[in-house]
Amino acid sequence: MSTSVEPNETEALLRKQNDLSTTASIEEKYPHQQGEAAEDDDDTLKRTQYDEAKETAESLKQVESILAPIVFTALSFFVRFYRISVNDHVVWDEAHFGKFGSYYLRHEFYHDVHPPLGKMLVGLSGYLAGYNGSWDFPSGEKYPDYIDYTKMRLFNATFSALCVPLAYFTGKEVGFSMFTTWLFTLMVALESSYVTLGKFILLDSMLLFFTVATVFCFSRFNNFNNKSQEFSRKWWKWILLTGVSIGCTCSVKMVGLFVTTLVGIYTVVDLWNKLSDKSISWTKYIQHWFARIVALILVPIFIFMLSFKVHFDLLYKSGTGDANMSSLFQANLAGSDVGGGPREVSMFHSVITLKNQGLSGGLLHSHVQTFPEGSKQQQVTTYGHKDSNNNWIFQRARGQPYYDTSGNTTDIEYIFDGMHVRLMHPQTGRNLHTHDIPAPVSKSEYEVACYGNLTIGDPKDNWTVEIMEQASDEDKMRLHPLTSSFRLKNEVMNCYLGVTGTTLPQWGFRQGEVVCYKNPFKKDKRTWWNIENNRNAVLPPAPEDFKLPKTKFIRDFIQLNLAMMATNNALVPDTEKQDDLASSFWQWPTLNVGIRMCGWGPENPKYYMIGSPATTWTSTVGVILFAFIVLYYLIRWQRQYVDFPSTNPHKLKLFLMGGIYPMFGWGLHFLPFAIMGRVTYVHHYVPALYFAMLVFCYEVESFSSRLNKPNASPVSKLLYLAIYIGLLSLVAGTFWYFRYLSWGMEGPKEDWKHLKLLESWRVSDDQYT
């Protein structure tokens, strides 16, 4: 069978043969050019594969940046929400902050050492839970059925859980690699003390949230703080948000001043560097100052003051904290018993109370007990509570005729500026008196006591009324309750009645010390007094149309903050009592002790607040190690080594934002508790721990990055992965092992003996039950 071929097909076959022959001849004549063409094809293929791999990596990076924070946040919410309502009793400081939340819902004024924002948020949680504020959260009591305490706890736990995504994004902004960011985020998510505190109605999670937010915002701002982006919208956005976060942190607890100082250090360094940059004009440099003054000073102050304005507006009824404010402020509270008497003060007939206008305030007080040393006469103190021993009566000065008490009520002697008087204590019949004897505590001033009676005494009983200010439009020469500020000068000793702010020892019932100041300056409010209550059966009541002047917000704001400071300074350890919950600063980073947060009987779940060994111990080692790292770099810098070349700005940024500033943050939040005199507790380490974990993760990043260089061997890359897998597993495994310290240990304490890692942990022992 023959095969026929069409002419066109024949031509095609011939052309193909010729092409093949031509190609073969070219390859034979120019073999090196053919090799180069093959190499070009290989390079093109490699570039294509590289581009595809790069696109894949970028896609995975984008997926990770979305998926990872979601996963970590979900984990954080789970460990904090799980078993959150299993203990239906008031746990630990819920007794304080739950009660403060109730005051907001009842609008009753109260006093506390902390600023109001966190407690107003507690009140908000109660409002959202449908609670009416009628319960005072007695310690250890079971929650009534009408209080949805679970919702209130969930509200607080949300602040704790939201620290985790902020930690993730902070790690990214600082410059951590993906695995280091995961490690840092997991440490925050599974830190036992964070989880435990996040389950209850407390302020610590709110404080931590706003602290973490401040660190994130200023880390984010740092990445826009360069010449190409300065004063851009994002630059302004993040510096303003940093200021808002600072204001919120300080409005929860005054500990926020520590993170404020950290941002201040960063700002000073930044402005100093800009000052030495000759490319920045003076106009632009001044603009940098202006921006920071507005965003980092004025905005936080505004937020802080705004929280107090809302605080005053919400608490418009008389409550338990009235005595810490001025008499005029108290009189303007609804339901107050202050300020209801006559508007004039008269000799003998007016039974008055005297309120000091100094920092510690208090009402002038006396009782039958005497000073153990000095004159050994009847004690005179200041007292913050209502008491009949706070009452005083004006009498004529020693040497003048006694006031006629035969029943003539028409001859009224009003108290006026410059008048010489005696002050008699009606409960004991003795006169307010001073003499050349040192005060019991403040030895440089004169002692004030009560001495004699109506007929027995001497000229040192005499005092001169000096009116300093009048807040109303009434007769400026007369003494008026609430609105007249005055001093009392002893004629013989030439000194002024005042308070020191010092607390007397136990023999003085821990009441305030009263002295006679030898040389006070005229505006010293410790020597200023006003009449708070005025009972007088002879004088008519205040006119119906009379309205007390309102106090000014600024004055109330300053006074309340001074009162908060005074109360905080008074929280010193009592050597005569044992505080089983108190601890020393060195015990926190070492996990030497924790806190039993509730009763330790078998009937209720028990919570032991302590840090996780996997996060606290590692971060403590990290802080110590970092001090040596800084010393190492300083020595090398002194020897003119360049460890942070300008060609690698990422290394310097990572060192500063991941190491130096977090180290400052740890020191600022930890060291003050080592030197302050007030009583301290484990939860005071909560913000400092966050910075310590940042320092530790920087060290992990710094070391591990050397194992993951592009030209690293497979063994190095395997070791790199092993380090992170090991650390992540350690953090997760440690939390899981100790999880019921945070989730609640049910049954007898002996069943949980295996969780007692150190002998000092009071998990299963009978001590301090």
UniProtKB/Swiss-Prot annotation:
<feature type="glycosylation site" description="N-linked (GlcNAc...) asparagine">
    <location>
        <position position="226"/>
    </location>
</feature>
<feature type="region of interest" description="Disordered">
    <location>
        <begin position="1"/>
        <end position="44"/>
    </location>
</feature>
<dbReference type="GO" id="GO:0005886">
    <property type="term" value="C:plasma membrane"/>
</dbReference>
<dbReference type="GO" id="GO:0036178">
    <property type="term" value="P:filamentous growth of a population of unicellular organisms in response to neutral pH"/>
</dbReference>
<dbReference type="GO" id="GO:0016020">
    <property type="term" value="C:membrane"/>
</dbReference>
<dbReference type="InterPro" id="IPR036300">
    <property type="entry name" value="MIR_dom_sf"/>
</dbReference>
<dbReference type="GO" id="GO:0035269">
    <property type="term" value="P:protein O-linked mannosylation"/>
</dbReference>
<feature type="transmembrane region" description="Helical; Name=8">
    <location>
        <begin position="655"/>
        <end position="675"/>
    </location>
</feature>
<feature type="glycosylation site" description="N-linked (GlcNAc...) asparagine">
    <location>
        <position position="132"/>
    </location>
</feature>
<dbReference type="GO" id="GO:0004169">
    <property type="term" value="F:dolichyl-phosphate-mannose-protein mannosyltransferase activity"/>
</dbReference>
<feature type="glycosylation site" description="N-linked (GlcNAc...) asparagine">
    <location>
        <position position="462"/>
    </location>
</feature>
<feature type="transmembrane region" description="Helical; Name=7">
    <location>
        <begin position="615"/>
        <end position="635"/>
    </location>
</feature>
<comment type="similarity">
    <text>Belongs to the glycosyltransferase 39 family.</text>
</comment>
<dbReference type="InterPro" id="IPR032421">
    <property type="entry name" value="PMT_4TMC"/>
</dbReference>
<dbReference type="InterPro" id="IPR016093">
    <property type="entry name" value="MIR_motif"/>
</dbReference>
<keyword id="KW-1133">Transmembrane helix</keyword>
<feature type="transmembrane region" description="Helical; Name=6">
    <location>
        <begin position="288"/>
        <end position="308"/>
    </location>
</feature>
<protein>
    <recommendedName>
        <fullName>Dolichyl-phosphate-mannose--protein mannosyltransferase 2</fullName>
        <ecNumber>2.4.1.109</ecNumber>
    </recommendedName>
</protein>
<dbReference type="InterPro" id="IPR027005">
    <property type="entry name" value="GlyclTrfase_39-like"/>
</dbReference>
<dbReference type="Pfam" id="PF16192">
    <property type="entry name" value="PMT_4TMC"/>
</dbReference>
<dbReference type="GO" id="GO:0005789">
    <property type="term" value="C:endoplasmic reticulum membrane"/>
</dbReference>
<feature type="domain" description="MIR 3">
    <location>
        <begin position="474"/>
        <end position="534"/>
    </location>
</feature>
<feature type="domain" description="MIR 2">
    <location>
        <begin position="412"/>
        <end position="468"/>
    </location>
</feature>
<dbReference type="Pfam" id="PF02815">
    <property type="entry name" value="MIR"/>
</dbReference>
<comment type="function">
    <text>Protein mannosyltransferase (PMT) involved in hyphal growth and drug sensitivity. Transfers mannose from Dol-P-mannose to Ser or Thr residues on proteins. PMT1, PMT2 and PMT4 account for most of the protein-O-glycosylation activity, while PMT5 and PMT6 may specifically modulate a much narrower spectrum of target proteins. Essential protein that plays an important role in virulence.</text>
</comment>
<feature type="transmembrane region" description="Helical; Name=1">
    <location>
        <begin position="59"/>
        <end position="79"/>
    </location>
</feature>
<feature type="transmembrane region" description="Helical; Name=2">
    <location>
        <begin position="152"/>
        <end position="169"/>
    </location>
</feature>
<keyword id="KW-0472">Membrane</keyword>
<feature type="domain" description="MIR 1">
    <location>
        <begin position="342"/>
        <end position="397"/>
    </location>
</feature>
<feature type="transmembrane region" description="Helical; Name=3">
    <location>
        <begin position="176"/>
        <end position="194"/>
    </location>
</feature>
<feature type="glycosylation site" description="N-linked (GlcNAc...) asparagine">
    <location>
        <position position="324"/>
    </location>
</feature>
<dbReference type="GO" id="GO:0005783">
    <property type="term" value="C:endoplasmic reticulum"/>
</dbReference>
<keyword id="KW-0843">Virulence</keyword>
<feature type="transmembrane region" description="Helical; Name=4">
    <location>
        <begin position="200"/>
        <end position="218"/>
    </location>
</feature>
<feature type="transmembrane region" description="Helical; Name=10">
    <location>
        <begin position="718"/>
        <end position="738"/>
    </location>
</feature>
<keyword id="KW-0677">Repeat</keyword>
<keyword id="KW-0325">Glycoprotein</keyword>
<dbReference type="Pfam" id="PF02366">
    <property type="entry name" value="PMT"/>
</dbReference>
<comment type="pathway">
    <text>Protein modification; protein glycosylation.</text>
</comment>
<dbReference type="GO" id="GO:0044011">
    <property type="term" value="P:single-species biofilm formation on inanimate substrate"/>
</dbReference>
<feature type="transmembrane region" description="Helical; Name=9">
    <location>
        <begin position="679"/>
        <end position="699"/>
    </location>
</feature>
<keyword id="KW-0256">Endoplasmic reticulum</keyword>
